[in-house]
Amino acid sequence: MTSNDTIAAIATPPGRGGIGIVRISGTNLESLARGILGKLPDPRHAGLFSFLDQNSQIIDQGIALYFPSPHSYTGEEVLELQGHGGPAVMNLLLDRCLQLGARLAEPGEFTLRAFLNDKLDLAQAEGVADLIAASTANAARCAVRSLHGEFSSTIHQLVSALIDLRVLVEATLDFPEEEIDFLQSAHAAEQLATIRAKLEQVLVASRQGNLLQEGIKVVLAGQPNVGKSSLLNRLAGDEVAIVTDIPGTTRDTVRQSIEIEGIPLHLIDTAGLRETSDIVEQHGIARTYAAIEQADLVLLLVDSRHGVTEEDRSVLTRLPERLPVLTVHNKIDLSAQPPRLEENTSGPTIYLSAINGEGIELLRAALLKTAGWQANIAGEGAYMARQRHLQALIQAKELLERAAAWLHRADQLEILAEELRLAQQALSSITGEFTSDDLLGEIFSSFCIGK
């Protein structure tokens, strides 16, 4: 995974802009700097330079910044060339760096080198990418907390507490005749209970952060002409779907992303579900069920004038059992019913009008609740957790549940010790202490080139 060669890349987005940056990282950048700038800039001082080609002709004029090792982003020597942000200028400058011995950086390679040089751990490195990719203000704030090490610090505290408990258990194994009394006197059960409670708090906060990052996929399903497209337009605040009185107008899925309290909701309007001989409409219905398979939540729309019909119940039987369903009785403006939310054994039911907006706020609140959103946690305490973080936390939780069961079994302390070891390993994988090269490659390959 390690490499001592010099890498270079354009660090700013493609296209035209006021400023463009070429970033270089490696060892012994003096010769490269002399080839472009005429000299190595003073460390950590911005200087105005002419950027030169191989014939000493000026490519551009701009700012150069030099960061000596180890006090740089990557932990290596880093040189940043800040010029005018035209693509031709940036490419000429990058080509000059490659002529002088640098190679083009792979996606995420600067941050990978920062990780390998202990400038940040794996969760912080992922925080860099999450901050760049954040689509909402709340997601950006959570990503900054991860980048600054708040998530990692919490994980390290859990790992440290587990190590202390493991030391106690391993020591007990050396004195089998006193093992249970020894563990009881050291309050091992209380220590384990404290670790499990803290882990549960971290898992809840991480789920909130994952929700901020990923959002939820919501499919609008139902029979033709119940107002699915009208509801999509109402939630989106724009005319993103065609609305007519003709059943079967929507033949394909229409996708639109919105935010509710900073949570991305990926809405998918679908073809009306009914028996039809129309080949095109049949394809649309097939795509509807394909979208439902990938959804996190289904809004089943029905006409409030008719209520839930046998056809609607037939649709419900075809939905995956794991999938939460919100039943929406639309068109209350025509049925003269008040907007309301009813909690039923089958799930929440909302009465609303997509045309005049009555009951829409009830739907928004129900969407957040069903998604698991907890504003009191997510405001300042959520961690920008990825799916792999959640999997590691859940694995550690299950291992510690089993460990608690083994704790009072004098003849099974070896199993207890192993469960604790595996739980520690699962948590340590979050920060990269136990991580395969394949996983590192997968994580950093999703980064931008130049980062």
From Swiss-Prot:
Highest taxon listed in the record's lineage: Bacteria
Compartments (UniProt record): Cytoplasm
Entry annotated with the keyword Secreted: no
Main location class: cytoplasm
Transmembrane spans: none
TrmE-type G domain location: 215-372
Record EC number: 3.6.-.-
Subunit structure: Homodimer. Heterotetramer of two MnmE and two MnmG subunits.
One term of GO molecular function: GTP binding
UniProt: GTP binding residues: 225-230, 244-250, 269-272
Keywords associated with the record: Cytoplasm, GTP-binding, Hydrolase, Magnesium, Metal-binding, Nucleotide-binding, Potassium, tRNA processing
Essential cofactor(s): K(+)
Protein name: tRNA modification GTPase MnmE
Family: Belongs to the TRAFAC class TrmE-Era-EngA-EngB-Septin-like GTPase superfamily. TrmE GTPase family.
One GO-annotated biological process of the protein: tRNA wobble uridine modification
Positions of K(+) binding: 225, 244, 246, 249
Keyword field contains Transferase: no
Chain positions recorded as Mg(2+) binding sites: 229, 250
Annotated GO CC locations: cytosol
HAMAP family, per database record: GTPase_MnmE (MF_00379)
Biological role stated in the UniProt entry: Exhibits a very high intrinsic GTPase hydrolysis rate. Involved in the addition of a carboxymethylaminomethyl (cmnm) group at the wobble position (U34) of certain tRNAs, forming tRNA-cmnm(5)s(2)U34.
NCBIfam families assigned to the protein according to its UniProt record, in alphabetical order: mnmE_trmE_thdF, PRK05291.1-3, small_GTP
